[in-house]
Amino acid sequence: MTELLKTPIHPLYAKYGAKTIDFGGWDLPVQFAGIKAEHEAVRTDAGLFDVSHMGEILVKGPDSTSYLQYLLTNDIEKIKIGKAQYNIMCYETGGTVDDLVVYKKSETEYILVVNAANTDKDFEWMVKNIRGDVSVTNVSSEYGQLALQGPNAEKILAKLTDVDLSSISFFGFVEDADVAGVKTIISRSGYTGEDGFEIYMPSADAGKVFEAILAEGVAPIGLGARDTLRLEAVLALYGQELSKDITPLEAGLNFAVKLKKEADFIGKEALIKQKEVGLNRKLVGIELIERGIPRHDYPVFLNEEEIGIVTSGTQSPTLGTNIGLALIDTAYTEIGQEVEVGIRNKKVKAKIVPTPFYKRAK
């Protein structure tokens, strides 16, 4: 059996009562105090996640911008230095290699933050598709990454840094920011639907920053609540809402797919065609009317006919209802449409509802 990978924070997990699981080959905390309590802490106060398992890939060189324009669906030329952008990397078929965030450090240097389980695959794909004068380096092992999320995130982080956090706009970042005596990159971003920051630091210093933030009375948060939080906010999870068989258009991520950008990009032709012909299926929100929780891969029916599949589902701690995301035949995606979800050997009534399920008050 292959030994599970561990983040630089791993030695501290036991001290804070973590219960760990195998997540894409990593030994990561699924929970600390409990999923519901952790979820509520992030929605009402603040919580701290160890996300050091995420991959970081450095792209450098005079042709970095044009290379990323070719590789990614969003418009890289629109990113200013000190800003980040959500992006999709596609295959020629329009299916998804990964979803990721691009940080622009300078005109010739970018960092791509990718999903942990996809890091090696993404890196190989990027190297295979290199164009022009660029270098591509997997620097994942050099970085620790923490996410401080919740309405009080700014107030808490301000105690540990001199950086004026209020001046960092959404998807903006600052480099060389001192946090608890450690040089970091602070980005105003996250995966919870709340305000918050993602903080990058050298791996060796990650534990120090982790404990300094927890010492401010912040709850440590595991993967269980990370999933319920992102699901309420309808943020895609690779392997569920996105895959090599699911295009970003089907997943409703049109805002990150710039079909009109001048640059040709991998998958552009297939995506243009899919848009012109019209989508056969699309991602919708569902809420169960009867008892039961929709889970990944459960079938969705209408009058005995299978019309789609659940990609993610949970009991929503914020709403108290059972919710899910499902890829459904476009003909049946009207809000209010009643459907049934196959849960074990039973068909359970559900309806299509508007998304996101949760949106924070500005």
From Swiss-Prot:
Enzyme Commission (EC) number: 2.1.2.10
Classification via Pfam families: GCV_T, GCV_T_C
GO cellular component term of the entry, any: glycine cleavage complex
Annotated GO biological process: glycine decarboxylation via glycine cleavage system
Xref: InterPro entries: GCS_T (IPR006223), GCS_T_bac (IPR022903), GCST_C (IPR013977), GCV_T_N (IPR006222), GcvT/YgfZ/DmdA (IPR028896), GcvT/YgfZ_C (IPR029043), TrmE/GcvT_dom1 (IPR027266)
Family recorded in the similarity comment: Belongs to the GcvT family.
Domain of life: Bacteria
Molecular functions per Gene Ontology: aminomethyltransferase activity; transaminase activity
Catalytic reaction(s) noted: N(6)-[(R)-S(8)-aminomethyldihydrolipoyl]-L-lysyl-[protein] + (6S)-5,6,7,8-tetrahydrofolate = N(6)-[(R)-dihydrolipoyl]-L-lysyl-[protein] + (6R)-5,10-methylene-5,6,7,8-tetrahydrofolate + NH4(+)
Lineage: Bacteria, Bacillati, Bacillota, Bacilli, Bacillales
Description of how the protein assembles with itself and partners: The glycine cleavage system is composed of four proteins: P, T, L and H.
N-terminal signal peptide: none
Keywords: Aminotransferase, Transferase
Role description: The glycine cleavage system catalyzes the degradation of glycine.
Organism annotation: Listeria monocytogenes serotype 4b (strain CLIP80459)
Protein name, per record: Aminomethyltransferase
